[in-house]
Amino acid sequence: ITMGMWIGGDRDGNPFVTAETLKLSATVQSEVILNYYIDKVYTLYRNFSLSTNLSKTSEAVAKMAALSSDKSVYRENEPYRRAFHYIQSKLIQTLLYLKEGNFSGEGHRLADKAEAVLHANSATSVSHNGREIIPNYIQSKLSGSLDELRKEQLPSYKDAQEFKEDLLVIRDSLLEHNGQALVTGELTELLQAVDIFGFFLASIDMRQDSSVHEACVAELLASANIVKDY
């Protein structure tokens, strides 16, 4: 199953639907789905308090947990929770990149003063103009400090497949260590959502008046010296 829509792409007879309209529509869609993922991963983070004293984990999960900036002594023996913390931090930076055009790539971390972003309330805030769709817990911590955050940033995802692969690392570890019951439910539902929505939520159908298509084809044919008067 994949989702599709025409909002932002219906230019057939509507001069007010422009390239900027399409860009806004696609951006808002991505903001919505990234916020959804952040909330779901935060829920998993809260629920997966498995201790290494009771349950083993794979080496891949241990490596992911080690990359988390969550260094609390209360969670040092909870690799699954710290792994979800790491995943959430990457999603947050992906959302910031989308809104600020500030891509960090791998290996960067958020400044300590914004660390509480990852532990606060996950309620969302949506404004009427469609440009402030960002969780309150991000918005409150980053307000007025984005210039500094550009220097010390969270890691980010290149695409939804990379996000899914991180989730699969956790799923596979659970399956390998008698955690089948924990795989069903929220984790499986999140994996299904990633398959359906990716980082774009839905494709956008493009509709355009036939005269515009004709003019575009004519220009292409003329520039390629195929037909000068299409």
Predicted regions mapped to residue ranges:
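A generic secondary-structure signal for well-formed alpha-helical elements
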Residues: 41-48, 52
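Trp/Phe/Arg-rich N-terminal binding region typifying the photolyase-homology
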Residues: 3, 21, 25-26, 56-57
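Extended active-site and interfacial segments that coordinate phosphate-rich ligands
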Residues: 19-43, 219-221
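Active-site and channel-lining beta-strand-loop segments
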Residues: 3-17
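Extended, charge-enriched "interface" segments that sit outside catalytic cores
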Residues: 50-230
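Extended, Lys/Arg-enriched charged tracts that mediate electrostatic binding to polyanionic substrates
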Residues: 1-3, 180
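An acidic- and aromatic-residue-enriched active-site/binding cleft used to recognize and process polar
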Residues: 6-8, 20-22, 204-209
